[in-house]
């Protein structure tokens, strides 16, 4: 056996060992990932997080387990922990466009509006074809005070979601902030086929053709089930609050927003919007200067 042959065999053996270790690690990570998913699917979030945390310590360079833990934190309404995991991943995977979206979401849930918007903008920069679908970005524009950009986002979203009262309302809110309620009503987007209760009455209210009482009556009309009633109340209260806020009736707005924020966990992303808005109003109330002589 000559020296070159021995060297080649040595390299092949070493490469085989390294490949074997890599494959073994991959199998271990995938097995652990499946255990984490299984634990979470069975309702044991604490076990799933512990499995992920232990696995991350053993495989610090692998992002699969970090991603799983971050998503669990997000689902369990722990946005700060989710943000930390997503940030760690993005340092290792700066081209992971989906993680910018996910981090933007959990930053919004923490009222970090500018940071959230930066992440959503980065996501759109990387995946421009998603811009028309990204209504979440429009919401953050509103809370960040970027009303013209918000108006544009909701107009673009209208091209792919033509019968959504919520999109029309948020467009109205952005226009009202820059041009006043008369212009907002003038440019209010016409919606004819959104069957969610009581959004037909909400649309009429913002169009200047409906009343608060009509919305409240629609919420209870038809003897809805407990679940349907809760959903009707949520949407009714949220958009009544936003309507009165746009009209400058702060106390009435705050009352309805507070009602919509109760039980927000049951209403998905918009439930989180209600909570965020409620906390945002509370923050602004605390920051208002106290009148001289008041206690």
Please report, for each region that a protein language model flagged, where it lies by residue.
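Alpha-helical segment of the N-proximal tetratricopeptide repeat
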Residues: 28-54, 58-61, 68-75, 236-243
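Structural marker of alpha-solenoid helical repeat scaffolds
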Residues: 58, 92, 126, 160-161, ...
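Residue-level recognition of tetratricopeptide repeat
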Residues: 37, 71, 105, 139, ...
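Register position in tetratricopeptide repeats
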Residues: 41-42, 75-76, 109-110, 143-144, ...
């Amino acid at each position: 056996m000559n020296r070159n042959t021995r060297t080649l065999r040595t390299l092949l053996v070493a490469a085989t060992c390294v490949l074997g270790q890599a494959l073994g690690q991959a199998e271990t990570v995938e097995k652990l990932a499946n255990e984490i998913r299984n634990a979470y699917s069975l309702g044991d979030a604490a076990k799933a997080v512990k499995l992920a945390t232990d696995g991350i310590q053993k495989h610090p360079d692998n992002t699969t387990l970090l991603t799983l833990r971050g998503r669990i934190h997000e689902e369990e309404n722990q946005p700060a922990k989710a943000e930390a995991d997503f940030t760690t991943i993005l340092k290792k995977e700066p081209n992971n466009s989906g993680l910018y979206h996910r981090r933007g979401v959990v930053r919004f849930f923490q009222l970090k509006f500018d940071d959230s918007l930066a992440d959503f903008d980065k996501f759109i920069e990387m995946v421009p074809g998603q811009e028309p679908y990204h209504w979440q970005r429009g919401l953050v524009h509103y809370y960040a005070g970027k009303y013209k950009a918000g108006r544009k986002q909701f107009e673009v979203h209208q091209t792919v979601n033509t019968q959504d009262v919520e999109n029309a309302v948020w467009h109205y809110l952005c226009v009202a902030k820059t041009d006043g309620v008369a212009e907002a009503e003038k440019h209010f987007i016409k919606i004819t086929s959104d069957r969610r209760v009581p959004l037909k009455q909400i649309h009429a209210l913002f169009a200047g053709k409906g009343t608060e009482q009509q919305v409240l009556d629609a919420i209870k009309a038809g003897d809805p089930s407990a679940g349907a009633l809760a959903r009707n109340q949520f949407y009714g209260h949220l958009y009544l609050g936003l309507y009165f806020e746009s009209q400058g009736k702060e106390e009435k707005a705050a009352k309805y927003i507070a009602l919509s924020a109760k039980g927000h966990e049951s209403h998905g992303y918009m439930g989180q919007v209600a909570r965020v808005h409620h906390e945002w109003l509370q923050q602004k109330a605390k920051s208002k200067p106290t009148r001289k002589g008041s206690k």
